[in-house]
Amino acid sequence: MGSSVRKKKEKKKDFQKTKLKVGKAKEKPASFTDTSFKSRAIVVAQSSLTVEGPNPVEQFKHYLSLASTSRSENQRRDALAFLTTQLSHQPPNNPVGTPAILAKLLPLISDSNSGVRTQLYKLLQAFPSADIQPQVERISMYVRAGMTHLSADIRDDTLSIMEWLLEVAGSEVVSCAGGWMKTLNVFAAMLGWSSIVAANAAAAAGSAPRNKGWTSAPKSTFGAAKGGASYARQLLALAKFLEIGFRPEATGSGGQRTLWNSLYRLPRTSNPFGYLNLFGAPRDEDSEIYADREDRQRVFSRKWHAVITKGLEEAKKEGGAVGRAGAVLNQTLKDGLADYDDHVL
């Protein structure tokens, strides 16, 4: 009986207000902990406090690995943004080299996420032109694959990369292995001119052309706003590509100095004798290097001139932006092939 009364009093005491007396300190609770002491050091288990930050080289490699292998779209995009920031510094922070970066990131040209593709485009623009020019052949392979992708958005984004590549390394694009013929094949497929190519090939072989199905019909935008804009961009990109390919080579002033330079000066390109294909596999016509303007004019006139001329006739019928782009392409053809007959004769 006594214990129950004592417990009731203790419970009741918790709800009673303590009367404070003047000059007497407030009673401390039973769980009070004295924190008035001062410590000279704080020891945290399994942790270290250091002034030095993460290793910049390892951090760069970590984000490069995230950008190329992460399954998360947000992680890939954010990693590309970090790499773009590092490459945009003055001087650029590129500890692994441009070839290593491109080898890991070029497959992202056909990434399914538009944010990743946009960020990759910004990263490519951060590279100096001198770093891009020796890597044009590798870049062109992925760009050609993206330009013939099933997704229209991926084709449009890849076309932006092609436009940028023509700006920074146009002469290398048209003169690398497969850069002339394979790129023309891709433009023909993108513009819907594959049926014209097949018909011309059948006519040259002397066989009757096959009936065209709905999959091989010439491309038409039917007045669609987005489709018309994309079609016009493709025509203008093709015009830019042909303008660079038909551009006359710069000629020196001649003289004794030019002769000595041609004999003893070190080449500026990474593979100056690549057009000879001394140690590579045999190339077909599409994979060949067309290093000078005359070779490009010759093969274009034989295989592509009639195809593009017929495709332009269909493009001009649409008018608007497509018609104007077709006029630019038509003028490029006239200027580029104006002196071709003179060279042949």
From Swiss-Prot:
Pfam family, one: Ipi1_N
Top-level division of the source organism's lineage: Eukaryota
Biased composition (Basic residues): 1-11
Keywords carried by this UniProt record: Nucleus, Ribosome biogenesis, rRNA processing
GO terms for biological process, alphabetical: rRNA processing
InterPro entries: ARM-like, ARM-type_fold, Ipi1_N
Subcellular location: Nucleus
Chain segments carrying region Disordered: 1-29
Keyword Metal-binding: no
UniProt keyword annotation of Repeat present: no
GO cellular component, one term: nucleus
Assembly information from the UniProt record: Component of the RIX1 complex, composed of IPI1, RIX1/IPI2 and IPI3 in a 1:2:2 stoichiometry. The complex interacts (via RIX1) with MDN1 (via its hexameric AAA ATPase ring) and the pre-60S ribosome particles.
Family as reported in the entry's similarity comment: Belongs to the IPI1/TEX10 family.
Function: Component of the RIX1 complex required for processing of ITS2 sequences from 35S pre-rRNA.
The name this protein goes by in its record: Pre-rRNA-processing protein IPI1
Organism, as annotated: Pyricularia oryzae (strain 70-15 / ATCC MYA-4617 / FGSC 8958) (Rice blast fungus)
